[in-house]
Amino acid sequence: MKKLIMLSFALALSWGSANATDHYRNPVIPGFYPDPSICRVDSGYYLVNSTFDYFPGVPLWHSRDLVNWEQIGHCLTRKSQVNLSGALSWGGIYAPTIRYNEGTFYMITTNTTGGGNFLVYTDNPRGEWSDPVWLEQGGIDPSLYFEDGHCYMVSNPDDGIWLCEIEPKTGKTLKPSRRIWNGTGGRYPEGPHLYKKDGYYYLLISEGGTGYDHMLTMARSRSIDGPYTANPANPIMTHSGQLKQTSSIQGTGHADLVDAPDGSWWLVCLAFRPQIGEHHLTGRETYLAPVSWETNAWPVVNGNGGIDLEMTADLPVKVDKQRDFTTNIRFSSKQPLGYEWVYLRNPLMENYQLTSNALRLTGTSATLNSKDLPTFIGRRQQHIDFEATTQLNLSEAGVGDMAGLSVFMDLYAHYDIALRREADGKNTLVVEYWLNSIHHVAKEIPLKGSKPYLRVTGSRDHYRFFYSENGKSFTEVGVADTRYLSSETAGGFTGIILALFCQSAADASKPQADFYSFNYHPVN
C-alpha cells in the first residue's frame, strides 16, 4: 500500500505448539475475519475476508500449510477502490471471493454502501490492485469461475443463485443472467461458489442466515447452466442440529473449497465462538476442515459435517507450530504499521503520524459515536481471554478533549478508558460505557503524571479496565459486562476492535496524543 502507514511491520509473534503433525487449532484465523475465500497457486494458498466499514478493505493472507496464515496486504487500499462514507457495521464491503487465472489474481466483492458488485485484479498480490471494474449482475457475495477462456459470475439477486458470463477486465456481460438454483428452502441463499470435478459442476452455497441456523448446501449439474440437482445428504455442514447444539463453535457456513497439491480437499468457513450464553464478541472467524471427496461423489466435511476447536486431520504439509496472534509494538517511524491495523471508514491520513518514538493521533470533533471519520486506529480482539495495554501522552489538548483505548463494537456500543483534559490543564482518567442512548461514566480520577498506561482485559463475561502511572503497578478502575457489546445485543456483522483514538470537544480544537506502545496477548 503506497504512502499509508500500513506497510510491513516487524511483529513479535508468539507461537504455540501443535500436538503432532496431524493436529491443529481452530479458528486458524481468530477474530473478526469472516466470509473466507481461498485459492491455491502452485503450493501456496491465498485467502481473503470481508471488512464491512473498516479500511483498508479485504485482508489478503498467504499460507503454505493451510494452518499458519501471514497477512501480506489488503486488496482495497485506496478510496478510489472503496468509498465507505457513512458505512456502518452492517454495510460496506461484504463477502469477497479470490480466484487466480492465467497469471492474474481476481478479487470480487460487494460495496453495499455504494456501487454494488465489482472486482479488482493484479499480477502481484503483494502489490497494488486495480481500480474497480463494476459489474451489472446484482445481489451480494459474488464469485468467479474460469474455464476454457470463459469467466462466469455467480451471486444471489432476487433470493436465488444467478449465473452470467462476463469479461473480467471490463465488466461487460457477455451472456445474460439466469437463475440456476434456489437452494433447499433455507433462508437467505447466498455465498455461491462453483467448482468442476469429475465432469460435474458443483455449486456450494450457504443458507439459513449467518447465525445459529447457518448451513452449507450443494447441488451439481453436468452443464454449468443447469439444471442443478441437490445433494440428497444436504446440508453438507452445519452446527444447527442436535449433534452440535452444545459445541463451542456455532454458525458454521459461508465456505470455500480448495484442493492441495497432494490431492486432498479442504474447506475454509466462518463460524463464531459463544462465550457467555449465546453471546459472541470476537466476530465471525476463519475455520479449517478436511473434506473427503471421492470420484463422482459428494464432498463430506470432516466426516460428520461439523468442526471442533481441536482438530485431527492428515494435513498436506507438516505443521510443527501454530501461530498465536500476540503482538508487542513500540511505535516508531522506523517501523511502519502492520497490516492488522485498521481505520473506521476512509481515514484522514494527515491525522496519523509515526514519529521517532510514538504514533501521533490528531483528533477532530468526529467522535467514536459519529458516522463521520473519527481519529481511530485499532486491531481485532482475537482471543476470548486477553490483555491489551498502551501508554500515551495527551500532549496538546483543549478542555474536554480526549484520547485513549476503546473496546469498540460499533458507534452505538463501546467501552472506553481515556484521558480528558480539564480547565486547569491537567488530565482526568475517565472510564465510560456507551450503549445506544445510554451513556454511563463509571469512573473519573485526577491524574498526577502525564504519560499513564491504560489496560483492558477480557474474559468470557467481563471487560476490566486498569491504569498505571509507572507501567508496573496497575489499579482496576472499571468492569463491564461483555454481553452488551456482543453481536447478539449490538447487532451488525463485525467483532470487537481494540482501538486507539483521539477526539476534540470543540470544532476549533485539534488535540494531539502520542501513543508509545501497544501490547496484546492471550491470557490462558
Predicted regions and their residues:
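Carbohydrate-active catalytic/glycan-binding domains of CAZyme proteins
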Residues: 20-524
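C-terminal segment of classical bacterial N-terminal signal peptides
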Residues: 13-19
